[in-house]
């Protein structure tokens, strides 16, 4: 652009473009400020305080030195602007000067560790160096002639699953399992919204169900359903069930235990279409003896740029790049789900939005 001949409209456009560019360049600051708040336990302190807390009170509770109060204020200013804390004023008594205090908002309540809906492990996992460092190799990855190679593999020399399973007792594996368990607690919302989906089932297999967080919620809501958690042998090896909860080790790419329904929560987006098709066909085989009563229940993202608002669409597209770069997986649009489902031999499906940004997809033989 020739600045000497630019008009007011072009100047405004340039200014807005600069703001847009800088905002996205520095979005990482908001993420890291949130990570800092989570690691310090700011939401936990405010929750324990029982009411909005002043900066000096918060600094004392966090064992911060007085010299850090100004730093804490500036972090909270950004996080308050982003909706994670609410700013108010409190008075120490009649005639006393009012002080600024900070309270929780619905998003920061998701960071309170004593809450069953705590998502702090998600924040920890998503912003862990193992998730972020790979992006330094993105240009190298783009220039490599290997369609199957993920960005994670290009950067580290191993797949994410190999990295995760190197040590069955590793801190990274525990962190990943805790993140998946935390996300599973939000499944209670789905059970409330879609209770009818699970009514009438006699048995259910939760494929790649981890430690059984989701399965236990289903059993709690439907105690008559015989539930099986199906995952890799090393995941379920030391887990014990009971009469209506069984843990089975195996390989979902080879077979899936039979049941009235098969649950795939947060599974298919980890895999490309070819491998997802193999999983779905095995799930169809697992319910084949159940007649028209059998079904597969998928909980995953369904991208809909025409109906979703901008913020929701951006979140789903962010997730899509996470799946691509870490697993060579994908988040799918409705037409992609439809093709995958029909290619696996199913006759019909129904997509129902749940839990904010996920969808529940019922698939029928």
Curated annotation (Swiss-Prot):
Residues the record marks as active site: 269 (proton acceptor)
Record flagged with keyword Metal-binding: no
Q: Which reaction does it catalyse?
A: a 4'-hydroxyisoflavone + S-adenosyl-L-methionine = a 4'-methoxyisoflavone + S-adenosyl-L-homocysteine + H(+); (2R,3S)-2,4',7-trihydroxyisoflavanone + S-adenosyl-L-methionine = (2R,3S)-2,7-dihydroxy-4'-methoxyisoflavanone + S-adenosyl-L-homocysteine + H(+)
* Gene Ontology MF terms: 2,7,4'-trihydroxyisoflavanone-4'-O-methyltransferase activity; isoflavone 4'-O-methyltransferase activity; O-methyltransferase activity; protein dimerization activity
- Is rRNA-binding tagged as a keyword? no
**Alphabetized UniProt keyword annotations:** Methyltransferase, S-adenosyl-L-methionine, Transferase
Residues binding S-adenosyl-L-methionine, per UniProt: 207-210, 231-232, 251-252, 265
EC no. given is: 2.1.1.46, 2.1.1.212
Give the SUPFAM superfamilies listed for this entry.
S-adenosyl-L-methionine-dependent methyltransferases, Winged helix' DNA-binding domain
InterPro entries according to UniProt = COMT-like (IPR016461), O_MeTrfase_dom (IPR001077), Plant_O-MeTrfase_dimerisation (IPR012967), SAM-dependent_MTases_sf (IPR029063), WH-like_DNA-bd_sf (IPR036388), WH_DNA-bd_sf (IPR036390)
Provide the induction entry: Up-regulated by elicitor.
Which Pfam family is an annotated match for this chain, by its short name?
Answer: Methyltransf_2
BP terms from Gene Ontology: isoflavonoid phytoalexin biosynthetic process; methylation
- Function as written in the Swiss-Prot or TrEMBL entry: 2-hydroxyisoflavanone 4'-O-methyltransferase involved in the biosynthesis of formononetin. Can use 2,7,4'-trihydroxyisoflavanone as substrate, but not daidzein.
Q: Which family does it belong to?
A: Belongs to the class I-like SAM-binding methyltransferase superfamily. Cation-independent O-methyltransferase family. COMT subfamily.
* Record-given protein name: Isoflavone 4'-O-methyltransferase
Species of the source: Lotus japonicus (Lotus corniculatus var. japonicus)
């Amino acid at each position: 652009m020739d600045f000497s001949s630019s008009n007011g409209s072009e100047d405004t456009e340039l200014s807005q473009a600069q703001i847009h560019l800088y905002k996205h360049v520095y979005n990482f600051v908001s993420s890291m400020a949130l990570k800092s708040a989570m690691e310090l336990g700011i939401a936990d302190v405010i929750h324990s305080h029982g009411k909005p807390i002043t900066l000096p009170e918060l600094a004392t509770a966090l064992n911060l030195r007085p010299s850090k109060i100004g730093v804490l204020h500036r972090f909270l200013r950004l996080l308050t602007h982003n909706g994670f804390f609410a700013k108010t004023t409190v008075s120490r008594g009649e005639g006393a000067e009012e002080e600024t205090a900070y309270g929780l908002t619905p998003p920061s309540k998701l960071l309170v560790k004593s809450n069953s809906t705590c998502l702090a492990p998600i924040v920890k996992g998503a912003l862990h160096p193992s998730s972020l460092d790979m992006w330094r190799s993105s240009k190298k990855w783009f220039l490599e002639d290997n369609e199957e190679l993920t960005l994670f593999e290009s950067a580290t020399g191993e797949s994410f699953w190999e990295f995760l399973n190197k040590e069955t007792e590793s801190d990274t594996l525990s962190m990943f399992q805790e993140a998946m368990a935390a996300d599973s607690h939000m499944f209670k919302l789905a059970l409330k919204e879609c209770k009818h989906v699970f009514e009438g089932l006699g048995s259910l297999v939760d494929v790649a169900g981890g430690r059984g967080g989701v399965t236990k919620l289903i059993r709690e809501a439907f105690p008559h359903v015989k539930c099986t958690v199906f995952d890799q042998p090393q995941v379920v090896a030391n887990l014990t069930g009971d009469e209506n909860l069984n843990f089975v080790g195996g390989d979902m790419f080879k077979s899936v235990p039979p049941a009235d329904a098969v649950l795939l929560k947060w599974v298919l987006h980890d895999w490309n279409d070819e491998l997802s098709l193999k999983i779905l066909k095995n799930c169809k085989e697992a319910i084949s003896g159940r007649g028209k009563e059998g079904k597969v229940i998928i909980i995953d993202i369904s991208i809909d740029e025409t109906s979703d608002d901008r913020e929701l669409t951006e979140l789903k597209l962010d997730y899509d790049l996470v799946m691509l770069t870490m697993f060579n997986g994908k988040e799918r649009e409705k037409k992609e789900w439809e093709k995958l489902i029909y290619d696996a031999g199913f006759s019909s499906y129904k997509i129902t939005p749940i839990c904010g940004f996920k969808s529940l997809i019922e698939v029928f033989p």
